[in-house]
């Protein structure tokens, strides 16, 4: 079900950007990837530490005016956290397909401010202690909502760029627990816009 939904979202992204490109010639499709530093914030006494991960996916950059743009993305993101009990480390690995839709304000020098909502669809969830890995997907809610904000830069002549953002989780990711846990993390990555103009 989640795979079909992800494919449908990808089809909408590609079709929508292609249609807009045909009508306005102000749309770019791109690829992106980068590093995650994520953590889990919770209401109980567990002290989580940030854990590195990665993200990779597609984006569409839609010019609304000279200064404003809309950027929907379809990204696989490895998130989670880690904690230590009695000198034993446990990693929580949460894999999401995230769909942020960002409004961007574009400066003439290539810099961009961006912010917008994000919805994430859980793909996999595992808890790993030493060499033992346990599937915890049933303990994590299938959909996550967040707000994203950050800054980016695209080289006007080439279409290559860098992107930094912070994602603040808004919804409880615990399926069964009596306490609330939310995702939050920072991302740093690179991207490339095909047929980039301005």
Q: Where in the sequence are the language-model features?
A:
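Outer-membrane beta-barrel channels and translocator barrels
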Residues: 22-24, 65, 108, 156-158, ...
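Helix-adjacent hinge/juxtasegments
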Residues: 82-115
């Amino acid at each position: 079900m989640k795979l079909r939904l992800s494919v449908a979202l990808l089809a909408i992204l590609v079709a929508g950007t292609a249609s807009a490109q045909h009508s306005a010639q102000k749309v770019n499709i791109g690829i992106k990837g980068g590093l995650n530093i994520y953590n889990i914030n919770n209401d109980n006494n567990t002290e989580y530490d940030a854990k590195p991960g990665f993200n990779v996916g597609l984006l569409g950059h839609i010019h609304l005016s000279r200064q404003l743009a809309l950027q929907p993305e379809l990204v696989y993101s490895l998130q989670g956290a880690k904690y230590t009990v009695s000198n034993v480390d446990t990693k929580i690995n949460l894999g999401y397909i995230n769909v942020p839709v960002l409004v961007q304000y574009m400066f003439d020098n290539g810099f961009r401010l961006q912010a917008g909502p994000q919805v994430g669809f859980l793909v996999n969830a595992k808890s790993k202690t030493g060499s033992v890995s346990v599937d915890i997907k049933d303990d994590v809610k299938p959909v996550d909502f967040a707000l994203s904000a950050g800054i980016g830069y695209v080289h006007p002549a080439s279409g290559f760029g860098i992107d930094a953002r912070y994602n603040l989780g808004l919804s409880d990711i615990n399926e069964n627990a009596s306490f609330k846990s939310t995702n939050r993390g920072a991302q740093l990555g690179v991207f490339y816009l095909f047929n980039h103009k301005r």
